[in-house]
Amino acid sequence: MMVLQVSAAPRTVALTALLMVLLTSVVQGRATPENYLFQGRQECYAFNGTQRFLERYIYNREEFARFDSDVGEFRAVTELGRPAAEYWNSQKDILEEKRAVPDRMCRHNYELGGPMTLQRRVQPRVNVSPSKKGPLQHHNLLVCHVTDFYPGSIQVRWFLNGQEETAGVVSTNLIRNGDWTFQILVMLEMTPQQGDVYTCQVEHTSLDSPVTVEWKAQSDSARSKTLTGAGGFVLGLIICGVGIFMHRRSKKVQRGSA
């Protein structure tokens, strides 16, 4: 659903409303305040291809009358707005103008703003990490940080060794990044055991399929062995590459001397 708000109202209608409110106050014996605030606010709602237009009239922060395109006429919200609503409903030209607004203004603005709002999709970035470093079999908090996504509707779930975890899951509210994207933190209380695999799964309208990020529980020694093995493998590739390069270069030198 998209909502457009315009803090303005047609001058003639707004002026009529203001005069009627002030006159009604006088008739009811209430003193007109020295300072007062009158507002006319227009709102467009787009939902499933339909358009709805609301025009609200507010006096000193209290809405007293409105036009609703779903109703097709003005309605008094408080007794103060009854004279204005009755008068406007008696004016066919005003009613025709208001009834045309959904197609004339709302639909036009929706077509302009839709691609930047309702149709906009930005894929989330997902990162998983423990809140603190600690040994296995000790209580900890695993954090799934999901950020830079739009729109805000998102589903984040935790799995342990393929089974969904619902107990011990804590989530922040949706956080606005200030650039039309959002972020959220979804945390899982855990006591990791050697070999446990924790998975954060994210579902969002921008994704064709869920995104999953794993975190594997390892002891410091196992992690050190893994890093050492990975380092050795990379070093082996480098040495192998240098050897092949030197071998080819040696052959070229031999051919040149021959």
UniProtKB/Swiss-Prot annotation:
Keywords assigned by UniProt, alphabetized: Adaptive immunity, Cell membrane, Disulfide bond, Endoplasmic reticulum, Endosome, Glycoprotein, Golgi apparatus, Immunity, Lysosome, Membrane, MHC II, Signal, Transmembrane, Transmembrane helix
Residues with glycosylation annotation: 48
Annotated phenotype, changing residue 31 to L: In allele DPB1*75:01; requires 2 nucleotide substitutions
Known outcome of mutating residue 115 to A: In allele DPB1*01:01, allele DPB1*03:01, allele DPB1*03:02, allele DPB1*04:03, allele DPB1*05:01, allele DPB1*05:02, allele DPB1*06:01, allele DPB1*08:01, allele DPB1*08:02, allele DPB1*09:01, allele DPB1*09:02, allele DPB1*10:01, allele DPB1*11:01, allele DPB1*13:01, allele DPB1*13:02, allele DPB1*14:01, allele DPB1*14:02, allele DPB1*16:01, allele DPB1*17:01, allele DPB1*17:02, allele DPB1*19:01, allele DPB1*21:01, allele DPB1*21:02, allele DPB1*20:01, allele DPB1*22:01, allele DPB1*22:02, allele DPB1*25:01, allele DPB1*25:02, allele DPB1*26:01, allele DPB1*27:01, allele DPB1*29:01, allele DPB1*30:01, allele DPB1*31:01, allele DPB1*35:01, allele DPB1*36:01, allele DPB1*37:01, allele DPB1*38:01, allele DPB1*44:01, allele DPB1*45:01, allele DPB1*50:01, allele DPB1*52:01, allele DPB1*54:01, allele DPB1*55:01, allele DPB1*56:01, allele DPB1*57:01, allele DPB1*58:01, allele DPB1*63:01, allele DPB1*65:01, allele DPB1*67:01, allele DPB1*68:01, allele DPB1*69:01, allele DPB1*70:01, allele DPB1*76:01, allele DPB1*78:01, allele DPB1*79:01, allele DPB1*84:01, allele DPB1*85:01, allele DPB1*87:01, allele DPB1*88:01, allele DPB1*89:01, allele DPB1*90:01, allele DPB1*91:01, allele DPB1*92:01, allele DPB1*93:01, allele DPB1*97:01 and allele DPB1*98:01
Domain Ig-like C1-type: 124-212
Annotated effect of mutating residue 64 to Y: In allele DPB1*01:01, allele DPB1*01:02, allele DPB1*09:02, allele DPB1*11:01, allele DPB1*13:01, allele DPB1*15:01, allele DPB1*20:02, allele DPB1*21:02, allele DPB1*25:02, allele DPB1*26:01, allele DPB1*27:01, allele DPB1*39:01, allele DPB1*40:01, allele DPB1*49:01, allele DPB1*53:01, allele DPB1*65:01, allele DPB1*74:01, allele DPB1*85:01, allele DPB1*89:01 and allele DPB1*96:01
Side of membrane Cytoplasmic, spans: 247-258
GO MF entries: MHC class II protein complex binding; peptide antigen binding
Signal sequence residues: 1-29
Topology in the lipid bilayer: Single-pass type I membrane protein
PROSITE patterns linked: IG_LIKE, IG_MHC
Reported effect, residue 44 to G: In allele DPB1*26:02
Record has Membrane as a keyword: yes
Outcome recorded upon mutating residue 37 to V: In allele DPB1*01:01, allele DPB1*03:01, allele DPB1*05:02, allele DPB1*06:01, allele DPB1*09:01, allele DPB1*09:02, allele DPB1*10:01, allele DPB1*11:01, allele DPB1*11:02, allele DPB1*13:01, allele DPB1*13:02, allele DPB1*14:01, allele DPB1*14:02, allele DPB1*15:01, allele DPB1*16:02, allele DPB1*17:01, allele DPB1*17:02, allele DPB1*18:01, allele DPB1*20:02, allele DPB1*21:01, allele DPB1*21:02, allele DPB1*20:01, allele DPB1*22:02, allele DPB1*25:01, allele DPB1*25:02, allele DPB1*26:01, allele DPB1*27:01, allele DPB1*29:01, allele DPB1*30:01, allele DPB1*35:01, allele DPB1*36:01, allele DPB1*37:01, allele DPB1*44:01, allele DPB1*45:01, allele DPB1*50:01, allele DPB1*52:01, allele DPB1*54:01, allele DPB1*55:01, allele DPB1*56:01, allele DPB1*58:01, allele DPB1*66:01, allele DPB1*67:01, allele DPB1*69:01, allele DPB1*70:01, allele DPB1*74:01, allele DPB1*76:01, allele DPB1*78:01, allele DPB1*79:01, allele DPB1*85:01, allele DPB1*86:01, allele DPB1*87:01, allele DPB1*88:01, allele DPB1*89:01, allele DPB1*90:01, allele DPB1*91:01, allele DPB1*92:01, allele DPB1*93:01 and allele DPB1*98:01
Reported impact of residue 84 to E: In allele DPB1*01:02, allele DPB1*02:02, allele DPB1*02:03, allele DPB1*05:01, allele DPB1*08:02, allele DPB1*17:02, allele DPB1*19:01, allele DPB1*21:01, allele DPB1*22:01, allele DPB1*24:01, allele DPB1*30:01, allele DPB1*36:01, allele DPB1*38:01, allele DPB1*47:01, allele DPB1*54:01, allele DPB1*84:01 and allele DPB1*97:01
Effect of residue 62 to Q: Ind allele DPB1*11:01, allele DPB1*15:01 and allele DPB1*74:01
Location of the region described as Beta-2 in the Swiss-Prot/TrEMBL record: 122-215
Effect of residue 64 to L: In allele DPB1*02:02, allele DPB1*02:03, allele DPB1*05:01, allele DPB1*15:02, allele DPB1*17:02, allele DPB1*19:02, allele DPB1*21:01, allele DPB1*21:01, allele DPB1*22:01, allele DPB1*34:01, allele DPB1*36:01, allele DPB1*38:01, allele DPB1*44:01, allele DPB1*48:01, allele DPB1*58:01, allele DPB1*62:01, allele DPB1*63:01, allele DPB1*95:01 and allele DPB1*97:01
Mutagenesis / variant outcome for changing residue 98 to R: In allele DPB1*11:01, allele DPB1*15:01, allele DPB1*69:01 and allele DPB1*74:01
S-S bonds: 44-106, 144-200
Effect of residue 102 to L: In allele DPB1*78:01
Entry's Gene Ontology BP terms: adaptive immune response; antigen processing and presentation of exogenous peptide antigen via MHC class II; peptide antigen assembly with MHC class II protein complex; positive regulation of immune response; positive regulation of T cell activation; positive regulation of T cell proliferation; positive regulation of type II interferon production; T cell receptor signaling pathway
PANTHER family the record matches: HLA CLASS II HISTOCOMPATIBILITY ANTIGEN, DP BETA 1 CHAIN, MHC CLASS II-RELATED
Family (UniProt): Belongs to the MHC class II family.
Name under which the protein is recorded: HLA class II histocompatibility antigen, DP beta 1 chain
Source organism per UniProt: Homo sapiens
Taxonomic classification: Eukaryota, Metazoa, Chordata, Craniata, Vertebrata
